[in-house]
Amino acid sequence: MDLLLGHNQFLGISHISEERSRERDKKFSDVKNIYKVVEKAVDLGYKGMILETHPRMLEFLKYYKNNETFQIDFYLQLPYIQGYIQKMNEQGLSGLILEIVRRGGIKTLSSTVLKNLINYVKKDYITMAISFLQFERAPFRDINIKAILLHNVVTDLLLSLRISSALEDYNIFVEEKMEIKPGFITLNFELFKKSFEDWNIKPHLVMTPINPGGYDMNPSSSAVETALRNYAGEVIAMNILGGGAFSPSVSCSYLKSFKNIEYCVIGASSNEHLKELIKLFKE
């Protein structure tokens, strides 16, 4: 069972206290501090890192490419849902489209082209969504992307609406056209497993909450546990400490009871925490 470094801690996210959240946000507003933590994680044996197109992570990525004193596999989580919602609220659909297209290296769009794009999105949103994946991935072309993980908001919405074609199109497109391993994030692993089996879709990778308290394990911890023990694919466990509710040793023992968990996501932000966790999981 290998460890992946999470990224929420670098965005100032803490489930323990608002004060800790503010401290993290201040510390990691300087991306050099993110770089130091990731560099130490690699030195200790962490195998990869979760990324998304949050502005701070894009800034970190630029710093990484300019320095690159270590090599690491990146797992890219797409799309950046929070940013999409914020941009839509502030500037509408046209503002969102411009933002995504600019990430792909296109600086300007004529009003006619933009209008045509908006009409296209409204008529064929699935095809356009897949095209946007390429724009979202554009800033990461020069680094080692091990997998693209479809955000749980999108995965679980499509599962609940039973839109199998969109999930299958994504799976095929990422693997065959982008030549990257496709993956999914879900907060309902039982539904994910059953639906993909019913639709005969073969997922390469799935990331889902797994922890001893059943935190975010839907529809229930027992249902997820049963589904996991009967699942043959690769699994990434996230939320393994339940936002700090469970001790690392208890979580580690629990996770090791499942034979098909390939990776665990660790939200560590200090050298001491990084060392403690890798020692536990490698024992």
Task: Explain the meaning of each model-derived region.
Residues 1-69, 254:
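N-terminal binding-site loop/beta-alpha segment at the start of enzyme catalytic domains
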Residues 16-28, 87-88, 156-162, 215-219:
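Short, flexible/disordered intra-domain loops and linkers
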Residues 31-38, 42-48, 52-56, 66-160:
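Active-site beta->alpha loop and helix N-cap motifs at the rims of alpha/beta catalytic domains
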Residues 56, 82, 137-146, 153-283:
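Beta/alpha (TIM)-barrel catalytic core signal, keyed to glycine-rich beta->alpha loops juxtaposed to Asp/Glu
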Residues 57-77, 203-207, 259-261:
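Short, electropositive alpha-helical surface patch
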Residues 61-66, 89-91, 277-281:
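Short, aromatic/basic amphipathic alpha-helical patches
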